[in-house]
């Protein structure tokens, strides 16, 4: 069971060609019936008994095994101790640990499960502190503030990255140089290289869960978002990467880039769904798909744009009436924005332990980030209505438009200024994920000269050549 299976219970950034998509689809065929051969390994309690290699394999296999959903608090503490023992041995042994990992799928499962248990423990601890109903568990959690602590988890991920020198290796690959020249004694071993690589994806996820979206994107500076990337070979890692990158872009108001991220992974999933049927993760991916469509519906409402035909059809099928309500804006759309956001956002966590002595002071991180997002939605709530009026004129008096909208002229002026500022978005062109150029996100622009509004509209023609090439490739 992977991360997606528990949700809700639990390249190049430009348009990719169908040839590249087909390569990803073909690669996924190899993953459907994948078996890493480690299912027979039993959990061990010590790395010092028996064969050291076999013990380490057993520890890694146990680390990749999901914890039971109703696990007790003592079991969660024990799981944390086991992870500490495992990573301490890998990171602090005299010289590299000699072990050939069976596959990169396995390395991803270890990091994925490690972060999932951290995330679920933080949510559980916050829930106990806020309810104040179980004093025995609250006391146990109060006495162990560092168990599954944020610092400990981040320290493990950063240490694995540093030990493997994976960032230096990835940077060398981008320069066309030999990565082994920069790998060092540890990074040349598959165990360290794979754990280090997927720790980068893990950092993206953790920083996003903590609400630091710019740092989340910064962690991927040395990873190229294309079909050749290692994460693209593992369905769960591929899905996770694009989901968290897209969500981070959305929270940074880079809606165009967020739509591109979501569209990529949704098209990929739609093309591989026949291979997923019957697999253990099919239901989980289907649920996560609905979340992705909810996020793309939000982005399209805040940033109207043309979508891929496949995405557009599926979006109208899933959220047809709701999408229209979002696009019309106004106060009636606020509850729908909040509902979709809550259903599709990550399960945010707090970086610090809660205050068990004052339960009322503990804020739900999901509520906190939802409130931040809804403040942004409220700023742009009347943009669709204002836009519909401005499209009818080349010049218009501010007071006249205020009369149409039944608001005070100065209130309208503030709306117009906010709308114009929000229409300037950073859009990725090349380089790191945080880089980009400031562009106008709308085909409607205006300027204020005292009380006179000057309106200009530019419509980009559809790129018919690209459309024909894309559809011909699908037919032939």
UniProtKB/Swiss-Prot annotation:
It is found in: Cytoplasm. Disulfide bonds: none annotated. PROSITE patterns: PCI. One of its GO terms (molecular function) is translation initiation factor activity. Residues 257-452 form the PCI domain. InterPro entries: eIF3l (IPR019382), PCI_dom (IPR000717). The keyword Protein biosynthesis applies. The keyword Cytoplasm applies. One of its GO terms (biological process) is formation of cytoplasmic translation initiation complex. Its main location: cytoplasm. Keywords: Cytoplasm, Initiation factor, Protein biosynthesis. GO terms for cellular component: eukaryotic 43S preinitiation complex; eukaryotic 48S preinitiation complex; eukaryotic translation initiation factor 3 complex. Component of the eukaryotic translation initiation factor 3 (eIF-3) complex, which is involved in protein synthesis of a specialized repertoire of mRNAs and, together with other initiation factors, stimulates binding of mRNA and methionyl-tRNAi to the 40S ribosome. The eIF-3 complex specifically targets and initiates translation of a subset of mRNAs involved in cell proliferation. Component of the eukaryotic translation initiation factor 3 (eIF-3) complex. Belongs to the eIF-3 subunit L family. This is Eukaryotic translation initiation factor 3 subunit L. It comes from Neosartorya fischeri (strain ATCC 1020 / DSM 3700 / CBS 544.65 / FGSC A1164 / JCM 1740 / NRRL 181 / WB 181) (Aspergillus fischerianus).
């Amino acid at each position: 069971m992977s991360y997606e299976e528990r949700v809700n219970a639990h390249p190049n950034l430009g348009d990719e060609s169908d040839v590249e998509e087909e390569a990803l689809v073909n690669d996924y065929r190899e993953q459907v019936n994948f078996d890493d051969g480690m299912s027979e390994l039993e959990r061990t309690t010590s790395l010092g008994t028996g064969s050291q290699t076999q013990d380490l394999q057993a520890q890694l296999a146990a680390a990749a095994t999901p914890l039971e959903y109703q696990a007790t608090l003592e079991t969660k503490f024990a799981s944390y101790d086991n992870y500490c023992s495992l990573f301490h041995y890998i990171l602090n042994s005299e010289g590299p640990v000699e072990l050939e990992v069976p596959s990169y799928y396995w390395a991803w499962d270890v990091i994925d499960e490690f972060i999932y248990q951290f995330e679920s423990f933080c949510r559980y601890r916050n829930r106990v502190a806020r309810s104040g109903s179980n004093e025995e568990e609250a006391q146990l959690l109060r006495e162990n503030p560092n168990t599954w602590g944020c610092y400990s988890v981040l320290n493990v991920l950063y240490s694995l990255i540093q030990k493997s020198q994976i960032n230096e290796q990835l940077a060398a690959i981008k320069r066309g140089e030999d990565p082994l020249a920069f790998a060092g004694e540890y990074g040349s071993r598959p165990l360290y290289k794979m754990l280090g690589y997927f720790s980068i994806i893990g950092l993206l996820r953790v920083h996003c869960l903590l609400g630091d979206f710019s740092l989340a994107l910064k962690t991927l500076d040395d990873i190229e978002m294309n079909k050749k990337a290692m994460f693209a070979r593992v369905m769960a890692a591929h899905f996770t990467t694009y989901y968290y990158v897209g969500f981070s872009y959305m929270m940074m108001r880079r809606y165009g880039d967020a739509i591109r991220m979501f569209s990529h992974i949704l098209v990929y999933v739609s093309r591989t769904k026949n291979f997923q049927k019957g697999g253990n993760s099919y239901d989980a991916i289907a649920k996560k798909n609905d979340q992705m469509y909810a996020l793309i519906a939000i982005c399209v409402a805040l940033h109207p744009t043309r979508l891929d035909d496949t995405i557009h059809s599926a979006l109208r099928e899933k959220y047809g009436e709701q999408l229209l309500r979002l696009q019309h804006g106004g106060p009636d759309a606020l509850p729908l924005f909040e509902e979709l956001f809550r259903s599709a956002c990550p399960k945010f966590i707090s970086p610090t332990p809660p205050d068990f002595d004052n339960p009322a002071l503990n804020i739900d991180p999901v509520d906190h980030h939802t409130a931040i997002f809804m403040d942004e939605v409220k700023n742009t709530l009347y943009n669709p209505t204002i836009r519909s009026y401005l499209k009818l004129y080349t010049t218009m008096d501010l007071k006249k438009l205020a009369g149409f909208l039944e608001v005070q002229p100065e209130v309208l002026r503030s709306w117009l200024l906010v709308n114009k500022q929000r229409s300037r978005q950073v859009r990725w062109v090349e380089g790191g994920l945080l880089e980009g150029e400031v562009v106008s996100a709308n085909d409607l622009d205006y300027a204020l000269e005292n009380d006179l509004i000057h309106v200009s509209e530019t419509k980009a023609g559809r790129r018919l050549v690209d459309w024909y090439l894309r559809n011909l490739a699908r037919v032939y």
